[in-house]
Amino acid sequence: MRITIKRWGNSAGMVIPNIVMKELNLQPGQSVEAQVSNNQLILTPISRRYSLDELLAQCDMNAAELSEQDVWGKSTPAGDEIW
């Protein structure tokens, strides 16, 4: 895929096609890390850091609290561990 670099004031920029934005799950305004390696420009999305308030807002504070025995006693293997 070819993308043209265009003059943007004293800088230069390029437009990332929407299909690429969707494939990489990028949003307008999101930051990326830029690095040059072997004469290539590599852009890596920077993961969003959530605040404690944002994380707690996603919790169901009325959910029943399970005892440790319930959690461990009824668990199933998640990988290659042996039970």
Swiss-Prot record:
UniProt keyword annotations, A-Z: DNA-binding, Repressor, Toxin-antitoxin system, Transcription, Transcription regulation
Signal peptide: none
Domain SpoVT-AbrB: start-end pairs: 3-48
Cellular component, GO, one term: toxin-antitoxin complex
Entry keyword annotation includes Transcription: yes
Listed GO biological process terms: positive regulation of cell growth; regulation of DNA-templated transcription; regulation of growth; single-species biofilm formation
Disruption phenotype: No visible phenotype.
PROSITE patterns linked to this entry: SPOVT_ABRB
GO molecular function, one term: toxin sequestering activity
Inducing stimuli: Part of the chpS-chpB operon.
Subunit structure: Interacts with ChpB, inhibiting its endoribonuclease activity.
Function description: Antitoxin component of a type II toxin-antitoxin (TA) system. May be involved in the regulation of cell growth. It acts as a suppressor of the endoribonuclease (inhibitory function) of ChpB protein. Both ChpS and ChpB probably bind to the promoter region of the chpS-chpB operon to autoregulate their synthesis.
Similarity field: Belongs to the PemI family.
Protein name listed in UniProt: Antitoxin ChpS
Organism: Escherichia coli (strain K12)
